[in-house]
Amino acid sequence: MEGSGTEQKGSPKCSFLTNSLLCHENRQRLWRICNFIMFGFFSLAAYVQINDPDAEMWIVIYMIPAVLILFVSIKPDITGHVIWKLLADLHSAVCAVGAIYLSGCLYFYTSKNILHEEEGRELSGLLIISGWLLLCRKSHQSAIGAIRLIIAISVSTAPFFIWIYIYIDKEMRTSWPQHCKTVI
């Protein structure tokens, strides 16, 4: 209704065909969907660690962001809560330290594609965790902008494409350790 005072000045009306990504409600909806997709990714990543020799560590590493991101997909403003920020920052720091360690190992001991090495796949997972938690970090402070949304859509779909590539590449599967060959 025009003139009712309920419209926000400067924000386009929501409609499916026009301005769909520019509308605040649609950007917020896409942001929540991306977070739910990442919840699924982190949960699935935790599940496939079952056969890993150090499964306990990797299940925890993936389940912490899965739970944090599930909360974001349900209530995006949770990122402003001090406990959410503390857990996300602490976990990001731990993942960053692990990523630095694995990067060093890969740099000095690997000559192949890093995705062919278990440490390379672990490094990728740690970087995705840190990157996604960083992307969520200040999302409560302002409306989800187009750049953050484009990054979110790209990052939330990329792990699944990487998994498909890794799963389809027969050469890569031959170099997998035995515990990786019996998962999904």
Swiss-Prot record:
Q: Which residues cross the membrane?
A: 30-50, 54-74, 82-102, 121-137, 149-169
Tell me the Pfam families matching this sequence. Answer: TMEM220 (PF15071)
Name the record gives this protein: Transmembrane protein 220
Q: Which keywords does this Swiss-Prot/TrEMBL entry list? A: Membrane, Transmembrane, Transmembrane helix
**Entry membrane topology:** Multi-pass membrane protein
Cellular component terms (Gene Ontology): membrane
What is the species listed in this Swiss-Prot or TrEMBL entry? Xenopus laevis
Q: Where in the cell is it found?
A: Membrane
Primary location: membrane
